[in-house]
């Protein structure tokens, strides 16, 4: 679920997903099109593609199971769809953490959609 995604971002990247990634670049936030603008925006592009491959559940609403083991997030549960959503969220949170040094709020926050025209395939 989006609430769990926010929680994973806080745990892994130590930032608020809502305040840092909900309207960033061409892909962070609702929807997405165009070229990813920087490594953080690419994290969101890959996350969108990951959600697009998930079938059988609603990635934004369904609750998944995970645990923390030795500082790592471990996705669990019996539902393969929900587990896949967890893996998508975990990968994005790690990507955000690993690209914090190139995050550019001033340049890409509320980035104009007119600059996000030429889409790329997943």
Curated annotation (Swiss-Prot):
The active site is at 47, 89. It is found in: Secreted. Expressed by the venom gland. Its EC number is 3.1.1.4. GO terms for molecular function: calcium ion binding; calcium-dependent phospholipase A2 activity; phospholipid binding; toxin activity. SUPFAM superfamilies: Phospholipase A2, PLA2. Its cofactor is Ca(2+). Keywords: Calcium, Disulfide bond, Hemostasis impairing toxin, Hydrolase, Lipid degradation, Lipid metabolism, Metal-binding, Platelet aggregation inhibiting toxin, Secreted, Toxin. Ca(2+) binds at residues 27, 29, 31, 48. This is Acidic phospholipase A2 CTs-A3. It comes from Trimeresurus stejnegeri.
């Amino acid at each position: 679920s989006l609430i769990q995604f926010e929680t994973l971002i806080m745990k892994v990247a130590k930032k608020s997903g809502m305040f840092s990634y909900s309207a960033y670049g061409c892909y962070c936030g609702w929807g997405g099109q165009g070229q990813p603008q920087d490594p953080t925006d690419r994290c969101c592009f890959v996350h969108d593609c990951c959600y697009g491959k998930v079938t059988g559940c609603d990635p934004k609403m369904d609750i998944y199971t995970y645990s923390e083991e030795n500082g790592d997030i471990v996705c669990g549960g019996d539902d393969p769809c929900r587990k896949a959503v967890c893996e998508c969220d975990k990968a994005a949170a790690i990507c955000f953490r690993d690209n914090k040094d190139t995050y550019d709020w001033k340049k890409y926050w509320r980035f104009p959609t007119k600059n996000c025209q030429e889409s790329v395939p997943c």
